[in-house]
């Protein structure tokens, strides 16, 4: 049986898709098909301005729903709660690093950056979190693939940039670039960072069920439960991180109208439901309902 696997065309997206494709090849003949998305076409637009439309997702899932591809591979953090009708995330593979990292032009850490240093990031969450640690920092928008971001840093457009460690590692750049990783307790990552999701049409989930990593799936669902009940996207600075061990450790951080941080240990059996309640409570406290 042959599966056509849909993906974005960036180096990072292809690296993620190849990781999935190698596993699919254990059972299927695999063809990779590139689909352009809004996020690829409008490269100068900050992601928070896309407002929940799924800048890197919708075109892929539409191709899936229309039968142009059989499977779509996503970075799960980009997948909105509202999906293209007829599609479903059917599996996730084991999570890569959820952490954000700082890469500076001269090897400085966050603490060592000069006063008023310029940090490249378009993420409102990263800006808000870094400002709490270093209120003197200045921020400039930064989009593009990792190679582009690193080139702009080297050219002197920024003193430092912040990116996801998972992306560096998937492209093998972690061996070439010196960086400072931020533990999730310090810079709480966005929900589902470091997780690769595999989507299928509804009713065809069994095609990829053998790929699913249960620990990562639980972490993903807990984080998404919080975000869904909060009712926010990347236009609001929110970090949510879950780590499943004997219990599920959950950290939520909101930096909007006021600062709120919650840390809880949840039972595995009821973690998703408990996380949803936490999301509801946080929404009430910040937005009044």
Swiss-Prot record:
The protein, known as: Probable porphobilinogen deaminase
Gene Ontology CC entries for this record: cytoplasm
InterPro entries tied to this protein: HemC, Porphobilin_deaminase_cofac_BS, Porphobilin_deaminase_N, Porphobilinogen_deaminase_C, Porphobilinogen_deaminase_C_sf
Gene3D superfamilies: Periplasmic binding protein-like II (3.40.190.10), Porphobilinogen deaminase, C-terminal domain (3.30.160.40)
GO molecular function per UniProt: hydroxymethylbilane synthase activity
HAMAP family recorded: Porphobil_deam (MF_00260)
Pfam families: Porphobil_deam (PF01379), Porphobil_deamC (PF03900)
Misc: The porphobilinogen subunits are added to the dipyrromethane group.
Record text on cofactor binding: Binds 1 dipyrromethane group covalently.
Family (UniProt): Belongs to the HMBS family.
């Amino acid at each position: 049986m042959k599966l056509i696997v849909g993906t974005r065309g960036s180096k990072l997206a292809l690296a993620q898709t190849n990781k999935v494709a190698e596993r699919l090849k254990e059972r299927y003949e695999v063809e990779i098909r590139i689909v352009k998305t809004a996020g690829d076409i409008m490269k100068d637009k900050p992601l928070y301005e896309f407002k929940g439309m799924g800048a890197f997702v919708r075109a892929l899932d539409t191709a899936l729903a229309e039968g142009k591809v059989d499977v779509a591979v996503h970075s799960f953090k980009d997948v909105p709660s509202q999906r293209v009708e007829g599609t479903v995330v059917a599996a996730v593979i084991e999570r890569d690093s959820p952490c954000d990292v700082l890469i500076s032009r001269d090897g400085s850490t966050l603490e060592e950056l000069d006063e008023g240093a310029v940090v490249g990031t378009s993420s409102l969450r990263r800006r808000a979190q870094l400002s709490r640690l270093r209120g003197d920092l200045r921020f400039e928008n930064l989009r593009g693939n990792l190679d582009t971001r690193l080139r702009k840093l080297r050219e002197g457009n920024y003193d430092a940039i912040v990116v996801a460690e998972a992306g560096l590692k998937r492209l093998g750049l972690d061996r070439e670039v010196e960086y400072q990783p931020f533990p999730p307790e310090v810079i709480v990552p966005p929900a589902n960072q470091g997780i690769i999701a595999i989507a299928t049409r509804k009713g065809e989930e069994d095609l990829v069920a053998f790929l699913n990593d249960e620990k990562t799936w639980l972490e993903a669902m807990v984080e998404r439960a919080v975000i869904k009940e909060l009712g926010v996207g990347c236009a609001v600075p929110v970090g949510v991180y879950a780590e499943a061990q004997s219990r599920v450790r959950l950290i939520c951080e909101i930096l909007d109208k006021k600062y709120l941080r919650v840390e809880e240990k949840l039972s595995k059996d009821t973690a998703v439901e408990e996380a949803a309640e936490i999301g509801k409570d946080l929404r009430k406290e910040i937005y009044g309902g």
